[in-house]
Amino acid sequence: MRKSSLDARRMKAIGAGLVTGLALSMIVSAAQAQTRQGGRAPLVLADEGTFYAGGHYDQDHPARHIVGQVFVEYRIPADLKHPFPIVLVHGGNQSGSGWFSTPDGRPGWAQYFLRQGYAIYVVDQVARGRSAVVPEAYGSVATAQPLQYVLEKFTSQERYKLWPQASLHTQWPGKAEPGDPAFDQYWSSDIPGMQNRTLQAQMNIDALAALFDRIGPAILLVHSQSGAYAWPLAQARPDLVKAIVAAEPAGPPVHDVVVQSAQVFDTPWEKAIKQTDDDYYRDNPGVKPYGLTSTPLAYTPPVTAASPLQFVHQDKPERRDLARCWRQAEPARKLVAVGDRPILVVEAEASFYAGYNHCNVEYLEQAGVHTTFIRLADIGIHGNGHMMMMEKNSDEIAQVMVDWLDKVVGPMEAKQR
């Protein structure tokens, strides 16, 4: 039963004196809540709830579990200002909880978008968080990320300097080390996903398509790993995915890359770069057969076994601190339907993605997909790592996304004219 129904029944059952007392209590509670939220007025919701989207009965194992479903938590603000909700899909080793609060206890992007008048739908990816894990159907769980890896890549890269931009990192809250309350909160949220990444991706794409079928047209916000779901989902539901906001989406195209200083020399990048004339970034040998993804993408002309995509490597990087990009051999095939909506890619200044986010954008553009690319440093937002939604200036970054959405999608009133 919803809270509004309970309140209505209670109000009918009490007298005028109790109503007055209740009103005073609500005023005090609201003031206390505003104090807890740093002076912000309490969030007022018109509706909230949870459900599961997608999934099917597993016919391959005796237990016949439902598999492939995602858990969804939704909240609709009382002051709804925008026609399309935002679907937030977390990245690797995370769950939807990371959208609701930062490790140091501030409201997260979910609350920020709610306060701007957006309804939100927050997903736990298949086999993560509150989406059930069914080992016989999903296979092995990936090995957990080592603590040292997380320190080097996500929270304290400025100490290790394993890629050119790492030393610019300043925005992680707290000391970014074990025992620090904010770091311990973040490390507590780490959840490994499936070992089979292609299966994981396809299950999530299918479940997200079912979610859009249920809720109707919406904006898709992805981060990191889930960025690879955005392009096939846009093709699967071309009329429902109204815009894509991609915070450092999975990449780069064709090959993942490794950083030589971390993998070869195990030294800070300034020293490593002096020891080789080779590329600073090296390609992982694995190939993404559809360029941006390992899961199928529709191209024109079509990709077939007899006519696969052909790729070429950029002769030299645009700068020494950037990776050389892989592109399609010309004439490039075009991605079907992906470019039929506004797309934003956001890059954080000190992230390990800062060396190759541009490769995703260039690949999309070559395939006929116009993309807005915002390097946060270019607009005066400095010091962020890959987990930008958890860092000290997270609200400032969310506002960049809101401003862009206001331009390309617009508020409710504009859609009603």
Name every feature range the model reports, one short phrase each.
Residues 82-91:
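Short beta-strand element of the alpha/beta-hydrolase
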Residues 106-133:
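Conserved alpha/beta-hydrolase
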Residues 339, 345-347:
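Short beta-strand/loop motif that positions the catalytic acidic residue
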Residues 381-383, 387-417:
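Catalytic active-site module of serine/aspartate enzymes centered on a nucleophile-bearing elbow/loop
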Residues 221-230:
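Gly/Ala-rich beta-loop-alpha elbow adjacent to hydrolase catalytic centers
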Residues 92-104, 110, 129-130, 253-254, ...:
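Short substrate-entry loop that stabilizes the transition state in hydrolases
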Residues 171-173, 177-182, 188-191, 196-219:
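Conserved acidic catalytic loop of the alpha/beta-hydrolase fold
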Residues 35-81:
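N-terminal cap/lid segment of alpha/beta-hydrolase-fold proteins
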